[in-house]
Amino acid sequence: MASFSAETNSTDLLSQPWNEPPVILSMVILSLTFLLGLPGNGLVLWVAGLKMQRTVNTVWFLHLTLADLLCCLSLPFSLAHLALQGQWPYGRFLCELIPSIIVLNMFASVFLLTAISLDRCLVVFKPIWCQNHRNVGTACSICGCIWVVAFVMCIPVFVYREIFTADNHNRCGYKFGLSSSLDYPDFYGDPLENRSLENIVQLPGEMNDRLDPSSFQTNDHPWTVPTVFQPQTFQRPSADSLHRDSARLTSQNLYSNVFKPADVVSPKIPSGFPIKDQETSPLDNSDAFLSTHLKLFPSASSNSFYESELPQDFQDYYNLGQFEDDNQVPTPLVAITITRLVVGFLLPSVIMIACYSFIVFRMQRGRFAKSQSKTFRVAVVVVAVFLVCWTPYHIFGVLSLLIDPESPLGKTLMSWDHVSIALASANSCFNPFLYALLGKDFRKKARQSIQGILEAAFSEELTRSTHCNSNNVFSERNSTTV
């Protein structure tokens, strides 16, 4: 595809006026998320971290709150990036850091929620084991490992994110070798509206690189190319000159290249093409001649460009017409998207759904039916909200790999993609309110202190209840045996 987003793995935000409905909706969501999530998560972090007794449950939710708080701190940059239609005034470091924070929040949150689900499942099915092995130190070690893995999953953002310049504005986007994906790609304008091929792909060398016609005299495979200035004959370029000029190609945005007819190509002569002073008649059909002899266009049929003598990166440029004709998605981007989908969503979702299904089934069988653990309800609802917020993000990411961005469906998909990003970011502001609102009597909770609310939400009630029930069953079995 031709675009991928600044914050995400999937699609770049299209260049739309700030007053378009998708942009307005995204800005509203991001603004509310920041205004509510920053104080909410900060309050939970302060109370649960400094005022409450440290338990296994508080460790889980403290780290979850920390991940949400980091995401909220990055939202002003994302909001400004959206309002500026993709302009990036923050420099390269923040170009790598801000998108990675959102990805870090995704992986850290989903891994922590998976750990909480497994912990709840162990509490129900292995109460005796939990009494002996479930402790704060183990929970802290697991959280440390989760942060390390989440950071590793962000490495592609640091590797592939770069700053590009277009229309005197800095852009933050992915770059996969010669393939580049910038934020707000439509901001650059339609390449077909440009009147020169150099606006899309710069040929090696400039007009001031022309050599003195008398400096080279050779009859080795002359290529006659007329220009509007004077008739000239090009000689086969040397590998050294092509290697020097090809270095310039790596900085070009070669991902979505639209070749213009040769009659509108500005007559620039690549350096390293010696010129022999020879009178030649201009060709009437210059576009056909250029495509046949210089292989500038994908329709050319001649294979006499001496590929064996060209450096590899110049051969990549030479084969430009073949590697993006069908909007082929770069392989690294496919790998990043699929990895995030599987590791950051599908696999954890299956584990969490299975864990809570087993817990509900076990609780309905008898002795667990009366257990009303606030922590269990909090965990279930937090997982459900996470899935609701992040599902559109991953759906848009996969569809962006499959749908042509130039099709009507593709354009609609791209225009609403940043709404899915904003919705995913909004997940970071919900949890503090879920901790406070989940309970039988909200009015009673409203009269409690913040510390009392969090202590009730993060209580170890299920552990104690399960342990007591397990001891009762054990005692009943002993009395029956006697």
UniProtKB/Swiss-Prot annotation:
<feature type="transmembrane region" description="Helical; Name=5">
    <location>
        <begin position="341"/>
        <end position="360"/>
    </location>
</feature>
<dbReference type="Pfam" id="PF00001">
    <property type="entry name" value="7tm_1"/>
</dbReference>
<keyword id="KW-0765">Sulfation</keyword>
<protein>
    <recommendedName>
        <fullName>C3a anaphylatoxin chemotactic receptor</fullName>
    </recommendedName>
</protein>
<dbReference type="GO" id="GO:0007200">
    <property type="term" value="P:phospholipase C-activating G protein-coupled receptor signaling pathway"/>
</dbReference>
<feature type="transmembrane region" description="Helical; Name=3">
    <location>
        <begin position="97"/>
        <end position="118"/>
    </location>
</feature>
<keyword id="KW-1003">Cell membrane</keyword>
<feature type="topological domain" description="Cytoplasmic">
    <location>
        <begin position="361"/>
        <end position="377"/>
    </location>
</feature>
<comment type="similarity">
    <text>Belongs to the G-protein coupled receptor 1 family.</text>
</comment>
<feature type="transmembrane region" description="Helical; Name=2">
    <location>
        <begin position="58"/>
        <end position="80"/>
    </location>
</feature>
<feature type="topological domain" description="Extracellular">
    <location>
        <begin position="81"/>
        <end position="96"/>
    </location>
</feature>
<feature type="transmembrane region" description="Helical; Name=4">
    <location>
        <begin position="140"/>
        <end position="160"/>
    </location>
</feature>
<feature type="modified residue" description="Sulfotyrosine">
    <location>
        <position position="184"/>
    </location>
</feature>
<feature type="topological domain" description="Extracellular">
    <location>
        <begin position="161"/>
        <end position="340"/>
    </location>
</feature>
<dbReference type="GO" id="GO:0006935">
    <property type="term" value="P:chemotaxis"/>
</dbReference>
<feature type="modified residue" description="Phosphoserine">
    <location>
        <position position="459"/>
    </location>
</feature>
<dbReference type="InterPro" id="IPR017452">
    <property type="entry name" value="GPCR_Rhodpsn_7TM"/>
</dbReference>
<keyword id="KW-0145">Chemotaxis</keyword>
<dbReference type="GO" id="GO:0006954">
    <property type="term" value="P:inflammatory response"/>
</dbReference>
<feature type="topological domain" description="Cytoplasmic">
    <location>
        <begin position="47"/>
        <end position="57"/>
    </location>
</feature>
<keyword id="KW-1015">Disulfide bond</keyword>
<feature type="topological domain" description="Extracellular">
    <location>
        <begin position="1"/>
        <end position="23"/>
    </location>
</feature>
<feature type="transmembrane region" description="Helical; Name=1">
    <location>
        <begin position="24"/>
        <end position="46"/>
    </location>
</feature>
<feature type="topological domain" description="Cytoplasmic">
    <location>
        <begin position="119"/>
        <end position="139"/>
    </location>
</feature>
<feature type="transmembrane region" description="Helical; Name=7">
    <location>
        <begin position="418"/>
        <end position="438"/>
    </location>
</feature>
<dbReference type="InterPro" id="IPR001644">
    <property type="entry name" value="Anaphtx_C3AR1"/>
</dbReference>
<keyword id="KW-0597">Phosphoprotein</keyword>
<dbReference type="GO" id="GO:0007204">
    <property type="term" value="P:positive regulation of cytosolic calcium ion concentration"/>
</dbReference>
<keyword id="KW-0325">Glycoprotein</keyword>
<dbReference type="InterPro" id="IPR000276">
    <property type="entry name" value="GPCR_Rhodpsn"/>
</dbReference>
<keyword id="KW-0812">Transmembrane</keyword>
<dbReference type="InterPro" id="IPR000826">
    <property type="entry name" value="Formyl_rcpt-rel"/>
</dbReference>
<keyword id="KW-0807">Transducer</keyword>
<feature type="topological domain" description="Extracellular">
    <location>
        <begin position="401"/>
        <end position="417"/>
    </location>
</feature>
<dbReference type="InterPro" id="IPR002234">
    <property type="entry name" value="Anphylx_rcpt_C3a/C5a1-2"/>
</dbReference>
<feature type="modified residue" description="Phosphothreonine">
    <location>
        <position position="463"/>
    </location>
</feature>
<keyword id="KW-0675">Receptor</keyword>
<dbReference type="GO" id="GO:0004876">
    <property type="term" value="F:complement component C3a receptor activity"/>
</dbReference>
<comment type="subunit">
    <text>Interacts with VGF-derived peptide TLQP-21.</text>
</comment>
<feature type="modified residue" description="Sulfotyrosine">
    <location>
        <position position="318"/>
    </location>
</feature>
<feature type="disulfide bond">
    <location>
        <begin position="95"/>
        <end position="172"/>
    </location>
</feature>
<feature type="transmembrane region" description="Helical; Name=6">
    <location>
        <begin position="378"/>
        <end position="400"/>
    </location>
</feature>
